Amino acid sequence: RDILRHEAVKNAVIFCNRKRDIAELIKSLTRHGFSAVALHGDMTQSARLEALQRFKDGEVPLMIASDVAARGLDIAGLSHVFNFDVPSHAEDYVHRIGRTGRAGKSGRAFTIAASKDDIKYIGFIEKLISKPIPQITVVDGRVVESGAKSSASKPTISDGKAGAKADAKTDDSHASENS
């Protein structure tokens, strides 16, 4: 949430790996004053189209999505992409962050890496894209370290456009455990 506020997000797609996490994240964001819609494969086609249209029309600034939104969606002027979960397939990362900065426009992408598995997947992504992903570490909402590689145990990774790390994904009592 702090990143959303700090970045002055106009509109953003926030990717989660599991539908259950999408629902939990929407509840958490809503409790903290954010407006968001879901987009995932278990929704009917009409529900997906309605959610997407509300997002494109600017009625709702945040779309919390599964990888169903990572390919084939062209959202003009998308300011940010957040990977709430690091994708387990490096190619999915490339497709996710490709939703922003399209058609010569600028955009920013952030990936929250909070586990050893996340760091492992980041390594696969860096190998695929043939470059290191800049990292910054945030503790209690403050940047404590930034650079190409962080020695912190839970760095947050960016795609080279920007980066951030939350000490925990949410501070709500129901925060999800990702597997």
Q: Where are each of the predicted segments found?
A:
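Conserved helicase RecA-like core
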Residues: 1-149
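Basic Arg/Gly/Lys-rich low-complexity intrinsically disordered segments
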Residues: 57, 128, 137, 141-179
